[in-house]
Amino acid sequence: MKIMASGPFTSWQIDEEKMETVADFIFLGSKITVDNDCSHEIKRCLLLGRKAMTNLDSTLKVRDITLLTNVHLVKAMVFPVIIHRYESWIIKKAEHWKIDAFELCGWRRLLRIPWTARRSILSILKEINPEYSLEGLMLKLKFQYFGHWLHRASSLEKTLIWWKIERRRINQRQRMRWLNGITDSMDMSLSRLQERVKRREAWYAALHVFSKSPTWLSDWTAANNEGSEADIFASKFY
């Protein structure tokens, strides 16, 4: 039997049976680490998504299948692999770039564009014409989850999300909280978001619009001369 502990414990014994202490484990398809860092899980999901994209190669190369159908295939068979349990992630800026790089690599593979072609992100997105980006879908699902538990009177998830440790972190940077990702993405205070969520129909309509709005990928494109440097980053990632 194995156990994970956050304190300085070297050995555990239960009924005279010694427990093995581990730093991480897979639970319900997600990787849980002792430091609660989501970067390991994000990297793992992106690798699984890359494998799913590779398995689709033979199908995507069939010329009788239209581009629109291939785009729907990627969204139906690759995107869900990556966004599994996404609602619980705390994403840093570096992870945002990796997610966008993965999506760009997928579209380039779908269009069979070599890296030597030096196509910009903007031209690729115009040709694919996706209804929403991978990150836009992720944000929509995360905000739906946020609205769902906020509507509930009481739940374990609500208690865990609102709870925070009062003890100060000495000589360390303050960790990013899950709620910070919500407020930063919507550019609203938490109290204002709570008022928005109370109007359910308006809230879900806003999420539908927000999921199609520009995300990190478009900001990346504008900041890097229509994606030239971003293409280089994506090629190294893939």
Features from the language model and the residues they span:
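Short linear motifs embedded in intrinsically disordered, charge-biased segments
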Residues: M1-Y238
